[in-house]
Every structure is written in structure tokens, then in C-alpha cells.
Curated annotation (Swiss-Prot):
Keyword Ribosomal protein among record annotations: yes
Protein name: Small ribosomal subunit protein uS4
Lineage: Bacteria, Pseudomonadati, Pseudomonadota, Gammaproteobacteria, Methylococcales
Keywords associated with the record: Ribonucleoprotein, Ribosomal protein, RNA-binding, rRNA-binding
Domain of life assignment: Bacteria
Organism: Methylococcus capsulatus (strain ATCC 33009 / NCIMB 11132 / Bath)
């Protein structure tokens, strides 16, 4: 399955919520009718069956983190092998991706932009350049923007906006040096309540 390159607003309307596919500070509500599905007949959102609700939740989570279907299944398989709650393990794996950590630290305005920074070798991890977006960052790892990318306007703008909104508690960011420490994976209570990972677990448990 190819990565989706179409309108981001369409995906958010499809899931009925902001998937954070656009820059921070740019509310989708002013331009997207999130309470209406896309398409000519999208005026009313139909009542979903249990299976449809589970499928939609999986698609929503996959799209938030920009994960392809096969890779998402692999994450679920790994989450189910670990001790503890499979759903929370899944969120931990997704949140620990290098591209997501770059986004959480405010070095990019979207996860897609963060993925691009990593792929273009603009990110150092513990002093070494790493271009694998899916790399699992560990507690205490240091993530920083390489010197060649520190002058990029998009990086400066993203940091400025994130600083205004506030950084997540599980990262410690030095804005001036464009460097951050991944203190730990976030607790479930620190993540949004608009994600129902249990529906994803129910879907894959069938």
C-alpha cells in the first residue's frame, strides 16, 4: 500500500477528529468540517457496527503516526509479545519512534516533516547521524538537529510554535542548542483520551 499523499483535511474528516497532520497552531476546525465525513454524501455520519468502529480506530491511529499497514501489524505483534497491556505497549512503541520523538521535541511541525528530517540525515542520536524514522529511541537518548539543518526556517518555526504550546513532560528540550533528551516513554495518562487503543486490540484479537 502506497503512502497517502492527498489532502490531509480529507483524512481528518474521514476519522472525525484532528489527526495532527498539519502544523501546530493551524486548527483544522476553521477549514474542515470534522463532524462530517468527506464526499458528496458525507452530511451524516452513520452508526458504526462494532467491527467498523474497531477498524476506524485502527485507521485513525495508523494515520496519526503515519504507519503503513504491514508495519502497524508488526508493531501490534511486538506489543502483544511484551508483558503488560497490549494497547499501552502499542502506544509506547509508536511514541518511541525516532520521527515521533523529533516531532514531540518540536523540531518539526508534523510527523511527516519529522520523518523527512530523519530520512535526509538532519538528525543526530547520541552524537551519531541516524536516518531510520522507525528507530526505537530509549530513555536517556539525546536527539539533536545537525548543524547543517539548524538554519532551516521550518525547524526554527516549528520550535517557536511548540515552545508557545509547551513541550510534553517526557522530553527535555534545549531550544537554543536544538537538542533534547527523551526521558522516557509517556504514561498512558499523558496521551490524549481521543485514542481508544482497546478497540485496536479487539480488532486484532479476532
Amino acid at each position: 500500500m502506497a503512502r497517502y499523499l492527498g489532502p490531509k483535511c480529507k483524512l481528518s474528516r474521514r476519522e472525525g477528529t484532528d489527526l495532527f497532520l498539519k502544523s501546530r497552531g493551524k486548527s483544522l476546525e476553521s477549514k474542515c468540517k470534522l463532524d462530517q465525513p468527506p464526499g458528496q454524501h458525507g452530511q451524516k455520519r452513520p452508526r458504526l457496527s462494532d467491527y467498523a468502529a474497531q477498524l476506524r480506530e485502527k485507521q485513525k491511529l495508523r494515520r496519526i503516526y503515519g504507519i503503513m499497514e504491514r508495519q502497524f501489524r508488526n508493531y501490534y505483534a511486538e506489543a502483544s509479545r511484551r508483558k503488560g497491556s497490549t494497547g499501552e505497549n502499542l502506544l509506547t512503541l509508536l511514541e518511541s519512534r525516532l520521527d515521533n520523538v523529533v516531532y514531540r521535541m518540536g523540531f518539526a511541525s508534523t510527523r511527516a516533516e519529522a520523518r523527512q528530517l530523519v530520512s535526509h540525515k538532519a538528525i543526530n542520536l547520541n552524537g551519531r547521524t541516524l536516518n531510520i524514522p522507525s528507530y526505537q529511541v530509549q530513555s536517556g537518548d539525546v536527539v539533536e538537529i545537525r548543524d547543517k539543518a539548524k538554519s532551516q526556517g521550518r525547524v526554527k518555526d516549528a520550535l517557536q510554535v511548540t515552545e508557545q504550546y509547551g513541550f510534553p513532560s517526557w522530553v527535555d528540550v534545549d531550544v537554543k542548542s536544538m537538542k533534547g533528551i527523551f526521558k522516557s516513554a509517556p504514561e498512558r495518562s499523558e496521551l490524549g483520551s481521543d485514542i481508544n487503543e482497546q478497540l485496536v486490540v479487539e480488532l486484532y484479537s479476532k
